[in-house]
Amino acid sequence: MTEQTIDNILPASKNNVKQWYVVHTASGAEKRIKEDILRKIAKQKMTDFFEDILIPVFGVSEVKRGKNVKVEKKLMPSYILIKMNMTDKSWHLVKNISGVTGFLGSKIVPKALTESEIQNIFNNLEAEAKVAKNSKLYEVGEVVTVTDGPFETFMGTVEEIDKERNRLKVSVSIFGKATPIELNFNQVKKND
C-alpha cells in the first residue's frame, strides 16, 4: 500500500503548478507568520515553490486621540493566502511554522482556491476599501445634497451612517417636516 503523501495525491505538485491556499494562523500573528515563512523559504532555498504570500488587508482612517490615523483592517482575520506549489516539502515548511494551525481542506490534502474564489476575495478587498473610504466622507450632523432619486436637489442632514451597507440616513424637509430617508453614499454629495 502506498503512503498517503501530498506528492502522491496531488498531480499539480509534480508539474510545479502554483495555486492559492488558505492558511489558518493564530489570531493577530499573521504578519509574524508571513515573515517567518519568508525567512524559512530563503533559508531552505525553496523560492521556486512559492510565488506570493498575502494578508488580505484594507486601509481605513480612524480618529484616535483626536487625530486622523490610517490603520489596516484585516478582511480575513487569522488567515493568510499563499500561492505555492503544494508538495510534501512545501507543505511541511508552512505547517511547521509556529502559529500556523493548518491549511483549509482536509488534514492530508489542503484544498486550493478556485479562480472564482480568489477573484471574490480580491473583489471583497476592493469593496471594503471603497466602503471605508466613502464612509469617512460623511459625518453625522453634516449637511448634504441629494444627487439622485425622487429627492434630487433636496438638502438634508446626515443622521446615521451604515458602513456595512454603504448607506446613509438623511433627514430632508418635506412640506416643512423633517423626514428621514435612506440613501446610498453615491446618491449624495457634500455641500461646499
Curated annotation (Swiss-Prot):
Gene Ontology biological process terms, A to Z: DNA-templated transcription termination; regulation of DNA-templated transcription elongation; transcription antitermination; transcription elongation-coupled chromatin remodeling
Keywords linked to the UniProt accession: Transcription, Transcription antitermination, Transcription regulation, Transcription termination
Domain KOW: 140-168
SS bond list: none
SUPFAM superfamilies: N-utilization substance G protein NusG, N-terminal domain, Translation proteins SH3-like domain
Cellular component annotations (GO), alphabetically ordered: cytosol
Protein origin, superkingdom: Bacteria
Keyword Transcription attributed: yes
Record's function text: Participates in transcription elongation, termination and antitermination.
PANTHER family: RHO-INTERACTING TRANSCRIPTION TERMINATION FACTOR NUSG, TRANSCRIPTION TERMINATION_ANTITERMINATION PROTEIN NUSG
Membership in a protein family: Belongs to the NusG family.
The name this protein goes by in its record: Transcription termination/antitermination protein NusG
Species of provenance: Rickettsia typhi (strain ATCC VR-144 / Wilmington)
